[in-house]
Curated annotation (Swiss-Prot):
SUPFAM superfamilies: Preprotein translocase SecE subunit
Family recorded in the similarity comment: Belongs to the SecE/SEC61-gamma family.
InterPro entries according to UniProt: Prot_translocase_SecE_dom_sf, Translocase_Sec61-g, Translocase_SecE/Sec61-g
Ranges per topology, Extracellular: 62-72
Organism from which the protein derives: Encephalitozoon cuniculi (strain GB-M1)
Quaternary structure note: Heterotrimeric complex composed of SEC61-alpha, SEC61-beta and SEC61-gamma.
Protein name, UniProt field: Probable protein transport protein Sec61 subunit gamma
Alphabetized GO MF terms: protein transmembrane transporter activity
Cell compartment(s), UniProt: Endoplasmic reticulum membrane
UniProt keyword list: Endoplasmic reticulum, Membrane, Protein transport, Translocation, Transmembrane, Transmembrane helix, Transport
Annotated membrane topology: Single-pass membrane protein
Length: 72
């Protein structure tokens, strides 16, 4: 019986600690947030361009390997 009573208190204590932690956290300003979003967008764009370039280079190489001169 006492274990059933402790579960809600554990949960409420856990939620209370989460609330206190989130209040103590320092949130970024609008300028810092926009700078972070821009950096993430540039990084994602760079990875997309890099993936496209690798695919573009490997397609002709794959076609050369697959279509060997001995096969018709």
């Amino acid at each position: 019986m006492s274990q059933k009573l402790q579960k809600p208190s554990f949960l409420s204590e856990y939620l209370r600690s989460i609330r206190l932690f989130s209040k103590k956290c320092v949130r970024p300003s609008g300028k810092e947030l926009s700078m972070s979003i821009k950096r993430h967008a540039i990084g994602i764009g760079f990875l997309g361009i890099l993936g496209y370039a690798i695919k573009l280079i490997h397609i002709p190489i794959n076609n050369i390997i697959v279509s060997s001169p001995g096969k018709e």
